[in-house]
Amino acid sequence: MATTAQHANVQRARQGYEAFSKGDMAAIGELLADDVVWHVGGSSPISGDYKGKDAVFGFFGKLMEQTGGTFKLEVHDILANDEHTVTMVRETAARNGKKWDSKAVHVTHPDSAGRIKEFWAFQENSTAADEFFS
């Protein structure tokens, strides 16, 4: 079977998830547009629209604080073209004696330089996510 080259946005996404797993905010910062908008659906205390890199990094900090640093992402697959990147992930975490283990889909739109301009997270069970993070 012939091997095909990965789309550049697949490579960037893999770099981003690897940087997140290592807590490498400098590397993540290079992958984000300055005016990035990060959408986290639901009605929990971490839900909302985070605008700009500082707000996104603040969200990451809040996520780690809420889970005592246990929040992890496992990438299952990444699909991409010039306009979208879709990543299927498994999320795990622990919080207040509860365990979180869920599938999610992350959708990003890159800017002309390939940096993430907009991000959406879609949970397998948004009600359960709201309960876990509340």
What are these regions (language model features)?
Residues M1-S134:
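C-terminal and inter-domain tail/linker signature
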